[in-house]
């Protein structure tokens, strides 16, 4: 079992309060899905969009995640693009993923066959 530092955050009342205070229902939906991604797995922006019923809005998901720190601490590092590419300019993302056991096929791309949350 991989140690997940985010799992304790999900169990606290303070955490639930932060989520319930979101003014944007869409952001709430997106971040609720993101917090379900287990350590050692990744999901794509498109997969998250599809799960919330907005299949064509992967860029919207990316936009919400770029401001997720406004809502609390979420494991946004577990979200990559449809090719498994990590976010350009976010150097820490790879380190966070590797610490959870996520494997990479090259410098910037997660091994999606091995690490995809939704298959």
Where do the model's predicted regions map?
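Nucleic acid-binding interface residues in structured DNA/RNA-binding domains
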Residues: 2-119
């Amino acid at each position: 079992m991989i140690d997940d530092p985010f799992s304790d955050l999900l169990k606290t009342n303070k955490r639930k309060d932060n989520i319930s205070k979101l003014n944007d229902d869409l952001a709430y939906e997106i971040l609720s899905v993101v917090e379900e991604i287990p350590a050692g797995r990744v999901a794509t922006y498109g997969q998250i969009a599809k799960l919330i019923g907005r299949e064509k809005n992967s860029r919207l998901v990316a936009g919400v995640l770029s401001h997720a720190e406004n809502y609390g601490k979420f494991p946004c590092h577990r979200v990559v693009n449809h090719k498994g590419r990590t976010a350009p300019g976010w150097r820490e993302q790879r380190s966070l993923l590797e610490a959870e056991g996520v494997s990479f096929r090259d410098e910037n791309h997660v091994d999606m066959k091995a690490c995809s949350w939704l298959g």
